[in-house]
Curated annotation (Swiss-Prot):
The gene is FAD6. GO terms for cellular component: chloroplast; chloroplast envelope; chloroplast inner membrane; plasma membrane. Its main location: plastid. The chain crosses the membrane at residues 124-144, 149-169, 282-302, 303-323. It comes from Arabidopsis thaliana (Mouse-ear cress). This is Omega-6 fatty acid desaturase, chloroplastic.
Length: 448
């Protein structure tokens, strides 16, 4: 996700926001072709079907001229100085926006600076992670059982966060950073994903592509830009996209879960047998676990003990993955312009969350070292991050989770444009962008 600094400022003024057009940088810029970050809606989420990035610009520019009142431009800064990056960081809700990584730096160059210790697997630390997740999830279920109705949202928030830790454990297993025994990793990963009704092997296969093609237009299996031709395809589709990227965006990972993991046609022939085993495990859990829950506590109990924590998990799944790689200055590039080192270092965001979230989710937010090498266990990510800050810190994007950061992502990072990175929905279809207008007015603009 190589990035360059957009040649403009995104101005926040109370509840209203403006994203000016970004003039094209000089050809000498290390990042010539910025991309965009967004997620496709419903089955279009995360590359439901292929689009052609080269055809994106024309339909976008066709609609911009009639909505000048929606996005008033401001004077574009140089964008090359530390002062300009600091201004952009402040306006986007970041602590730091990194400098352009030189073109001649490779991913191996960065990896070679990491201490060897960060790659070491420690069975006791891995077991500690499992105990933290099992204990916190059990505590969450107890809280749900004992809480009066008005405290249930807090119990659900805790339990949804705790069960996200199960996903991170399975995530380590998929990257072969949990145990030196592959069979143990497959068993633990499958079991950890079961309460989430997430098929382990299908997710593993697709997630490997995310790491191999991070922020590559079309090919990345994580959040993809909204292609302009799809945004323009029909009024119904446009409204669905706007709503999906509006109020329900923090749960849009549910669409990714449905779209990517249950269709055997999406997998290679060599993968299908393992995919079938994972699907059988998930369906068995649903066939046995769900009726058992209903038998014990009824349909409302199923909603109370399983569905609401599951929605809490998907809030974090969507939020973490959005924040990891989404910002107005982070490009999404076509394959012929993509650079691995820039994508993994410049295009990944380190974001600090409240400590209890980081503990329950096993430091999944410490994401830059994970993209330098997925083989780093979650319990070594902080040591690896410190090393990266010492050696490559000026190139990194740093943030603390805040309202302005989320407001930027949810109200600005929408439609792909090669020149501007993102074009917000309300610049293209202001009359249909009421959900975005609502978010601009309703979401606070705080950074603290």
């Amino acid at each position: 996700m190589a990035s360059r600094i957009a040649d403009s400022l995104f101005a926040f003024t109370g509840p209203q926001q403006c994203l000016p057009r970004v003039p094209k940088l000089a050809a000498s810029s290390a990042r010539v072709s910025p991309g965009v970050y967004a997620v496709k809606p419903i089955d279009l989420l995360l590359k439901g079907r292929t689009h052609r990035s080269r055809r994106c610009v024309a339909p976008v520019k066709r609609r911009i001229g009639c909505i000048k009142a929606v996005a008033a431009p401001v004077a574009p800064p140089s964008a090359d100085s530390a002062e300009d990056r600091e201004q952009l960081a402040e306006s986007y809700g970041f602590r730091q926006i990194g400098e352009d990584l030189p073109e001649n730096v490779t991913l191996k160059d960065i990896m070679d600076t990491l201490p060897k210790e960060v790659f070491e697997i420690d069975d006791l630390k891995a077991l500690k992670s499992v105990l933290i997740s099992v204990t916190s999830y059990t505590l969450g279920l107890f809280m749900i059982a004992k809480s009066p109705w008005y405290l249930l949202p807090l119990a659900w928030a805790w339990t949804g966060t705790a069960i996200t830790g199960f996903f991170v454990i399975g995530h380590d297993c998929a990257h072969k950073s949990f145990s030196k025994n592959k069979l143990v990793e497959d068993i633990v990963g499958t079991l950890a994903f079961l309460p989430l009704v997430y098929p382990y092997e299908p997710w593993r296969f697709k997630h490997d592509r995310h790491h191999a093609k991070t922020n590559m237009l079309v090919h990345d299996t994580a959040w993809q830009p909204v292609p302009p031709e799809e945004f323009e395809s029909s009024p119904v589709m446009r409204k669905a996209i706007i709503f999906g990227y509006g109020p329900i965006r923090p749960w849009l990972s549910i669409a990714h879960w449905v779209n990517w993991h249950f269709n055997l046609k999406k997998f290679r022939a060599s993968e299908v047998n393992r995919v079938k085993i994972s699907l059988a495990c998930v369906f068995a859990f649903m066939a046995v676990g769900w009726p058992l829950i209903v038998y014990k506590v009824g349909i409302l109990g199923w909603v109370k003990f399983w569905l609401m924590p599951w929605l809490g998990y998907h809030f974090w799944m969507s939020t973490f993955t959005m924040v990891h790689h989404t910002a107005p200055h982070i490009p999404f590039k076509p394959a012929d312009e993509w650079n691995a080192a820039q994508a993994q270092l410049n295009g990944t965001v380190h974001c600090d969350y409240p400590s209890w979230i980081e503990i329950l989710c096993h430091d999944i937010n410490v994401h830059i070292p994970h993209h330098i090498s997925p083989r780093i266990p979650s319990y070594n990510l902080r040591a690896a991050h410190e090393s990266i800050q010492e050696n490559w810190g000026k190139y990194t994007n740093l943030a603390t989770w805040n309202w302005r950061l989320m407001k930027t992502i949810m109200t600005v990072c929408h439609v792909y444009d090669k020149e501007e990175n993102y074009i917000p929905f309300d610049r293209l279809a202001p009359e249909e962008s009421q959900p975005i207008t609502f978010l601009k007015k309703a979401m606070p603009n705080y950074t603290a």
